[in-house]
């Protein structure tokens, strides 16, 4: 069995970490896994780091990183994966909702046919204000990217190391790793996993994520579909804008002819506010979208050269 690296971001999860470590260690011992755990404290304000320090002191296969601030899950995963040494990387949340007992089943699914196994919380122990938006989000991701999973948001995943070597996470792109990996030719599958009710603390996510998630989805759709050929996308917007302008010019030309012939009392088309505002907004919206996508492309390319986080401490 290849050696395993559990990469676990944690933000204010002081009450869960010791129990999670014990559960992972039990599963690893029962299956004779050669493993390590990399905890990443993402700027916690409680005693999360103290618990991690004590676990690292007592267990030589527990490593840890403390980030200087709350950089988000994507940055924490990137930092943890960089520190890890395993051939396979297992990511899971620190809140005990992901069940380590599912690891053998997930590893069994990672055959020669697949490079990433994503968990699917088929039966979720979450309130409806989390489950319904998640269903809509997963449907939209499948529609726009072609990567159809039931649960893109599930943090419980098994990766071949090469995925983290080639897919550079930044912002809040952690939920789109299957999409980004598939765009690079990696093979992705999904299996149902047990999802447990939260035992300690409170959820760090809610409805406020939806607008950001949708914008990130548009970004990923652009990066995976037009990364190497942005002119295909920007050209379509340009053609649409040109067509609107051409139609306006044509309409004014027809108007001018009619006015000269029979309707001198008509208000000139170019003096009608609705038309002027509509054309102006169309052009402005196209310019803003184009600049936004180009900025995202520049950021995505730049992330391969600069880490999106700052490390305060390491325990190796």
Q: Where are each of the predicted segments found?
A:
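A conserved acidic beta->alpha catalytic loop
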Residues: 41-50, 96-97
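Short beta-strand/loop segment that forms part of the nucleotide-sugar
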Residues: 21, 25, 33-43, 65-66
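Acceptor/aglycone-binding surface of glycosyltransferases and processive sugar-polymer synthases
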Residues: 63-69, 73-83, 88, 97-183, ...
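Short, well-formed alpha-helical segments that are part of the catalytic scaffolds
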Residues: 13-28
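Hydrophobic helical membrane-anchoring modules
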Residues: 176-316
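Cell-envelope/extracellular polymer assembly enzymes that use nucleotide-activated donors
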Residues: 3-5, 36
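Acidic helix N-cap motif at the loop->helix transition within catalytic regions
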Residues: 15-19, 46-55
């Amino acid at each position: 069995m290849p050696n395993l690296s559990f990469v676990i971001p944690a933000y204010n999860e002081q009450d869960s970490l010791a129990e999670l470590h014990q559960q992972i260690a039990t599963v690893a011992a029962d299956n004779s896994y050669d493993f390590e755990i990399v905890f990443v404290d993402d700027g916690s304000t409680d005693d999360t780091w103290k618990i991690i320090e004590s676990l690292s002191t007592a267990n030589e296969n527990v490593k840890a990183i403390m980030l200087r601030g709350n950089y988000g899950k994507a940055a924490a995963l990137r930092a943890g994966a960089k520190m890890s040494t395993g051939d396979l990387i297992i990511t899971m949340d620190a809140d005990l909702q992901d069940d380590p007992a599912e690891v053998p089943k997930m590893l069994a699914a990672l055959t020669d046919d697949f490079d990433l196994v994503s968990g699917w919380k088929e039966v979720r122990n979450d309130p409806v204000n989390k489950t319904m938006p998640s269903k809509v989000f997963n449907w939209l991701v499948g529609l726009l990217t072609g990567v159809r999973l039931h649960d893109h948001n599930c943090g419980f995943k098994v990766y071949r190391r090469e995925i983290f070597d080639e897919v550079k996470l930044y912002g809040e792109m952690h939920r789109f790793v299957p999409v980004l990996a598939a765009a690079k030719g990696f093979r992705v599958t999904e299996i149902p996993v047990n999802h447990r009710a939260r035992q300690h603390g409170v959820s760090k996510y809610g409805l406020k994520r939806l607008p950001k998630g949708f914008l990130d989805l548009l970004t990923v759709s652009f990066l995976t579909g037009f990364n190497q050929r942005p002119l295909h996308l920007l050209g379509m917007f340009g053609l649409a804008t040109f067509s609107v302008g051409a139609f306006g010019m044509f309409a004014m030309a027809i108007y001018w002819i009619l006015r000269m012939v029979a309707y001198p009392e008509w208000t000139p088309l170019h003096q009608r506010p609705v038309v002027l505002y509509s054309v102006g907004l169309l052009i402005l919206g196209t310019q803003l979208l184009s600049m936004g996508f180009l900025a995202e492309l520049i950021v995505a390319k730049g992330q391969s050269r600069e880490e999106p986080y700052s490390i305060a401490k390491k325990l190796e």
